[in-house]
Amino acid sequence: MDTRFHCVYLLTSLDPQCEGDFYIGYTVNPLRRLRQHNGELVNGARRTSRRGRPWTIVCCVSGFPDDRAALKFEWCWQHPTASARLRHAIDILTGLRRLPYAVATLHLLVRASLFCRLDLTLHIFESALLQEAAARAEVLLARRRGAFAVGGGLRASSPRVGTQQHSQRSSSLQGQADGVATPPLPALDSKGELQDASTAAALATTTAASHLLPPLTPSLLFHVEDTTRQAFEDAYLSHDRCLLLPSVGMGVDVGEAGKEGSHMSASAGTSCPYDVSLLSQAARAEWSNASFASDSDDEDTRRFAPYCPSTGSRTPSPQRVHTAASPALLGYRSEERAGDGVLEASPGSSIGCGAALRSFSSPPPPRASSPRSASCPPLYTGINASASLAVDAPHGGVTDACTSSPAAAPAPQPRIPLRFADYGEVDFARAHAEEQHRLHHGLLPCSLCTLPLQPSCVAYCSRAPFCTLRCHLSCLAMWMLYAEAEAAATVDGTDKSPALLSQAPPAPISPLRRLIPSQPCPCPLCGVLLHWGSLVKELKKRVVVERRLHAAQRRIRMEQRWQARLAHIDHTKRSTSAAMRRRQRTRVGAAALAKGAGEAPGAASTVRASTMHVGPARRDAPRVSSPSCLGEPTLTSFAAAASCPSPSTSLAALSPAASASPISRHNGHSNTVTATNTAVAAAAAVSDASLLSLTDFCEEDWLLP
């Protein structure tokens, strides 16, 4: 599935010498492409590099299912006279040049039979330039048709002036007959430009008085939003768009649900593509103001209240044009018109009320007595209010689109299950987590064929999660084609009134018409109109957001594990360095011990070894004490004192009591006493030697003359 962002953009030059020059192109990132055209990045177009820099983006059209449809739109916009979609309607644009010509072509192209069934969105970056170009196109087209008088440009004897005066007189009489006041005509110079005195007023008056070009009116399948470059990048081009959702930023906690199974975690709300905060607020506000319907047959349903307090969305997305609804999220519509049986926004109320009201904006199918009409109700009229013109290729002309019948009775508003009355953010997050668990384990059946669904390619109703329609994309296409065929058979076989004949489907535009639905169909569960283009667009948007949510969660988990690993490494490094310092101090102490003790331990061991290996007679014989045993200092003691001349060590070496070898006696305890005294003297020498080895201080240096 191609989930890229396909759009066709319109550029215009800001160079005063190239005023009005335009460029039309296709890309998946219009902001990056604009930098390429301006020379900031490489791989720009040759046409925009020669002259006209700097360029600015006026608008772009998005919502194409794949690159082929977007490239077709681009080619038709670039070559309107050669296109089969506009060649029969492009004659009305004769005389237009530069940017007004491109804008007028856009007005006609979005209503062509090939593109009016797609869920397209017009993103306007420079609304002033777009409105000015459309107004100038209206003025020039009206002047070419002879509806305005050129001030001072032609002579009175010219036959063209007489034709213009006759047309002006006829239009004035027609306006008086209709009871409509004809606005004053603006004055034009010889070049066809408006005079400076009344430029803005003339443009506004001309646009309001004569609609030679079909207006860009938002509808179910055509959306208009006035945005900025930063908001556009955050909403459509940023890979961290999912992190801007309040449900992801807040980290909805599902409480004890994480202990029930492995598929539920404490952060299940972060994987929900819906704005659970907005859903809970809308449901709470709706149920607090809703009341039971008097003609309701089901006690478990309620009608939607006409009033709903406004609840702003925290999702940063551009504001829609000509609508007071909140920004649209996944699976919801926000541009439904009052002509389609939808509640219109009032100054004191918000038509959106978040995602809940957008999901309830379309009416359900009317009740019918026959089983056929109950299962497949007839299609609604007035589906796309923006499709005021449609090119009929076989007949070679521009025909008016089907309009809703004035005699049609207003359909009842859709109903909502009562189980959502007490739903909060945690409940929506838990329900979505459970549904995703069932979907990934093959436990979620299709609503139409009851076969298990596979992830990603699942079609949802526009009222999701309030509507439980979950089905395969192919099953939904077959259902819509079947409903369309049933409606056509009902119109052709039973009733042939003019109102129903206007609902007949148009002529097929391609051999693949039987595979792709071309008409909307009511939902089999809730009755809301489902448009194929909107469903495909929402499906791709859902797939993209879910992938980015999973990627963001994976990145967050990796960062947490990396931080934990770094903390463990830091702790290990600190403990290792402390152990190394302890070992170093131990080695220094051992070296000082060996240096302070000198040869005393070796001599004692030698004496003990010789004593152990002598014979019994030799051991019991009386021994003569050496002078050192009588208290005289030995050479070893003097050597130790000279090497580490401390007062305690010197005194211990010179005193008879501290000698290492006392007088030997003939009893058996003499060897034990000698060893004990030797160990005590060695310990005292070690402590003093350790202290002096750490300081390079020598007492004899101070005593020398």
Curated annotation (Swiss-Prot):
<keyword id="KW-0378">Hydrolase</keyword>
<keyword id="KW-0540">Nuclease</keyword>
<dbReference type="Pfam" id="PF01541">
    <property type="entry name" value="GIY-YIG"/>
</dbReference>
<comment type="similarity">
    <text>Belongs to the SLX1 family.</text>
</comment>
<keyword id="KW-0233">DNA recombination</keyword>
<keyword id="KW-0227">DNA damage</keyword>
<keyword id="KW-0863">Zinc-finger</keyword>
<dbReference type="GO" id="GO:0006281">
    <property type="term" value="P:DNA repair"/>
</dbReference>
<dbReference type="GO" id="GO:0033557">
    <property type="term" value="C:Slx1-Slx4 complex"/>
</dbReference>
<dbReference type="GO" id="GO:0017108">
    <property type="term" value="F:5'-flap endonuclease activity"/>
</dbReference>
<dbReference type="GO" id="GO:0008270">
    <property type="term" value="F:zinc ion binding"/>
</dbReference>
<feature type="compositionally biased region" description="Low complexity">
    <location>
        <begin position="595"/>
        <end position="604"/>
    </location>
</feature>
<keyword id="KW-0255">Endonuclease</keyword>
<comment type="function">
    <text>Catalytic subunit of a heterodimeric structure-specific endonuclease that resolves DNA secondary structures generated during DNA repair and recombination. Has endonuclease activity towards branched DNA substrates, introducing single-strand cuts in duplex DNA close to junctions with ss-DNA.</text>
</comment>
<keyword id="KW-0539">Nucleus</keyword>
<dbReference type="InterPro" id="IPR027520">
    <property type="entry name" value="Slx1"/>
</dbReference>
<dbReference type="InterPro" id="IPR035901">
    <property type="entry name" value="GIY-YIG_endonuc_sf"/>
</dbReference>
<dbReference type="InterPro" id="IPR000305">
    <property type="entry name" value="GIY-YIG_endonuc"/>
</dbReference>
<keyword id="KW-0479">Metal-binding</keyword>
<feature type="zinc finger region" description="SLX1-type">
    <location>
        <begin position="446"/>
        <end position="526"/>
    </location>
</feature>
<feature type="region of interest" description="Disordered">
    <location>
        <begin position="595"/>
        <end position="628"/>
    </location>
</feature>
<feature type="region of interest" description="Disordered">
    <location>
        <begin position="155"/>
        <end position="192"/>
    </location>
</feature>
<keyword id="KW-0862">Zinc</keyword>
<feature type="region of interest" description="Disordered">
    <location>
        <begin position="290"/>
        <end position="323"/>
    </location>
</feature>
<feature type="domain" description="GIY-YIG">
    <location>
        <begin position="4"/>
        <end position="90"/>
    </location>
</feature>
<feature type="compositionally biased region" description="Polar residues">
    <location>
        <begin position="310"/>
        <end position="320"/>
    </location>
</feature>
<feature type="compositionally biased region" description="Polar residues">
    <location>
        <begin position="160"/>
        <end position="175"/>
    </location>
</feature>
<keyword id="KW-0234">DNA repair</keyword>
<comment type="subunit">
    <text>Forms a heterodimer with a member of the SLX4 family.</text>
</comment>
<protein>
    <recommendedName>
        <fullName>Structure-specific endonuclease subunit SLX1 homolog</fullName>
        <ecNumber>3.1.-.-</ecNumber>
    </recommendedName>
</protein>
<dbReference type="GO" id="GO:0006310">
    <property type="term" value="P:DNA recombination"/>
</dbReference>
<dbReference type="InterPro" id="IPR013083">
    <property type="entry name" value="Znf_RING/FYVE/PHD"/>
</dbReference>
<dbReference type="InterPro" id="IPR050381">
    <property type="entry name" value="SLX1_endonuclease"/>
</dbReference>
